[in-house]
Amino acid sequence: MLQLEKTIGDYLEYCEYQKNLSPHTLKAYRIDLSQFLQFMRGTDGELNKSNLSRYYVHLHKAYKPKSVKRKIACLKAFCGWLEYEEIIEQNPFFKLKIKYQEPRLLPRTIPIHVIQTLLSAAYDDLKAARTAYQSRSALRNTAVLELLFATGVRVSELCSLGEGDVDLVNMTVRVLGKGSKERVIQIGNTQVMQILKRYQSTHSQAISESGFFFVNRDNRRLSEQSVRFMIHKYVDRQGIALHITPHMFRHSFATLLLEEDVDIRYIQQLLGHSSIVTTQIYTHVASSKQRDILTAKHPRNKLAI
């Protein structure tokens, strides 16, 4: 019988040291595989189709389809590794059909005037700063918001940017995305570049010591939660009646580029999507925007017949 607990530990070490997965992804894998291990303790312990099917049913009773899909994907990757390492003879997912009835949810975006309000609030903080601490904090917050919107990076990617990943000479950002896939994004706006240069100049010592481009007040890597809290602070202070997350800047980045007739293949590259199918969901958002515009602005509305 497979020593499941030990092999899960070995697999997580492989993910950390050989696949170089992010701490966030590793944490999710650890939780997902621990849940599977707990379930397997109530079975005969065999890693087979029968137990996997029962586990799938078990997950559906407790989680939303999107969460089930993620947990099964983690388990598939684990079983694929077991087969590759010849710990098992055949992947138990082979010929096991799993269907997900996942509702198609369109990405939530931030209206452009709200993005302007948030950026203006950050710049206002910078102008109003009276102490060195206030200035440094406001400068970092402004740079974070500008870079989120300028590049469409995930918040995890932003917080993981290293000292050398932001090239202010060539105006590029090197991003290490999912699956350790690297992409380079150009920064085309001079105001964004100016704020990044000011931030880097002011925080150069902390950046050098931490090894990360964005740092907190303790001169350590800025956390994803800190970014969420910072955005919430501006939203709350400006009286914006929306729940805004860092990821919504990514959705807005993609959707607004589509509305400006940017080729979807370029947007796919900018977002770091391995499949264009993932990017195509933004076309539905752009289409709904188009419908609103035509309903309100089409000249036919002015014709009295």
Task: List each language-model region with its residue ranges.
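Conserved catalytic core of the tyrosine transesterase superfamily
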Residues: 1-305
